[in-house]
Amino acid sequence: MNSRLIVTGTDTGIGKTVFSAALCHALGAVYWKPVQSGLEEETDSEIVARLAQASPQRILPEAWRLNTPASPHLSARLDGVEIRPEEMHIPATSLPLVIEGAGGLLVPLNDKTLFADLFAIWRIPAILCARAALGTINHTLLSLEAMRSRDIPVLGVAFIGEANEDTETTIAHLGRVKRLGRLPLLDDLSPEKLHHSFARNFHIDDFAGVAR
């Protein structure tokens, strides 16, 4: 079976999509964003296609495309629809698959289901993206507890931002989790800069061959 990985995060806007693009490029993976909230600006699928330099065949269509950039449950309500998680089936691919959640781990899909609940059903190894800034210890440890309470397999934590050695070490130790690496913030972000930075700061063997 090919690698299948979930990319989730401690919060929205922390860099999951940029990390996902780097990971897709490194693995030659297919990308899938099940729920896209907000269509006026460049979507996450479009960002990944550009930064990963991925062909259209490697960017799968979203299961739900919602107009308002908000939590999926609210965005769906404003569009007059309800997200039905039971209808979201993991696509079969011949290549590795990277699945990116929307917002943070506990973002609601509807009035009953959180993204974490869907991940618990899928049981695919998940990468938790976390800031390296002040406050991230609490956010990251809480997210890890939420994942483990649902038996979501945790591959490790990917930090995003400026280096904070003590914070990263503390999270790895207290969270009993693998520290996968840290993706620094990049000025004038380009595909080439992103690919080079990922290769310097992560070990591809930590991601390759992971399957459930």
Swiss-Prot record:
Pfam families: AAA_26. HAMAP family: BioD. It is found in: Cytoplasm. It comes from Brucella melitensis biotype 2 (strain ATCC 23457). ATP binds at residues 13-18, 100-103, 184-186. It comes from the Bacteria. Its cofactor is Mg(2+). One of its GO terms (cellular component) is cytosol. One of its GO terms (biological process) is biotin biosynthetic process. It catalyses: (7R,8S)-7,8-diammoniononanoate + CO2 + ATP = (4R,5S)-dethiobiotin + ADP + phosphate + 3 H(+). Belongs to the dethiobiotin synthetase family. PANTHER family: ATP-DEPENDENT DETHIOBIOTIN SYNTHETASE BIOD 2, DETHIOBIOTIN SYNTHETASE. The gene is bioD. One of its GO terms (molecular function) is dethiobiotin synthase activity. This is ATP-dependent dethiobiotin synthetase BioD. Its EC number is 6.3.3.3.
